[in-house]
Structures are given as structure tokens and as C-alpha cells.
Amino acid sequence: MNSHENRKRKRKVNIADLIAPSFDEVFFDVEAHRHTFYMLAGGRGSAKSSFVGGIRIPLSMMEDPDIHVVVLRKVGNTIKNSVLPQIVWGLEQMGILDRFRIKMSPPEITYKPTGQKILFFGLDDPAKVKSIKLPFGYVGIVWFEELDQFSGMEEIRNVLQSLLRGGPSYQVFGTYN
């Protein structure tokens, strides 16, 4: 079997092997929907973004066909080199990249079986977040990457008031150094 065929073969992945041990407890807390807000601090290389973007977000989408995800950074032009590849990394690690369609401009990831979306926005243009229209479902997950770069709780609260409507439950992640 050549290397191309080997890559195309389905492989079983143990999700626990992909999660840094420091996030085991958080993983199960999120699974059980025990909280709405998860603020995860850690230095570079702490695996917080890998956990949220690479693993938790795709799993949550596959578990609940009604939710969509919005990923936010303070500056929009940083998305293509940060959070988007982080999520793609997770899809590759879990062996499920073929179930998702990746669009670079504007950045967007679609779960092919249901049409659910991961939408990316920079808050350097906050009006874009207010005009989100989804074909079905609701925004069930919001991820603020580099949370410490946002202006403060008022900015975050304004965004959440625009996004968190019409669903039975939500999860908000904030990752920062």
C-alpha cells in the first residue's frame, strides 16, 4: 500500500490520547454541560486552543446537529494563521477531516452531513457578528481566542447578546495566556 492509500484509510482514534491530561476534567464537564462559561488560561504550548478548537468544537457539532459555532479573535486578519488551522489540525488528528469542507475566504468550516457551520470573525468589525443569519439551528458555541486582547466584559457581553439567541443551551470558551 502506498503512502497516499495509507492516509486515506480510516483509522480509529482514541480521543483521550489527543487531550492533554490537564484538560481531562474540563472535557467531562463540557460533555455533561455542567457550565456555560469556560475560561482556560495557559501559556504557549499549554494545549488550551488544541483542546477547544481542535477537539471540543468538532465533537460538539457532531453530537448536536442543531448547533453552529462562532470563533472570535480581536483582529480578523489573524484567523487564517491561528484558529482556522488549529481546528483543521484537530480534524486531521481525529481522522474526520473528510467530513468537513474548509473555505478560506471568508474563513468557514462546514460539517458536510448536516450543513452546520463554524464561522470566524474578527471584532475589529463587530457589525459583522450582529448580522449572522443561519439556515437552521442556533449558535451553540462561541470561542473567544486570545480573550485578553478584547476590550473588556462590555465588549464580550455585547457580542454574546447578539449571538446567543434561540437555543436551549450554550457554551462559551475563552482562551488566553
Model-predicted segments: where are they?
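Phosphate/NTP-binding elements of NTP-utilizing enzymes
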Residues: 1-177
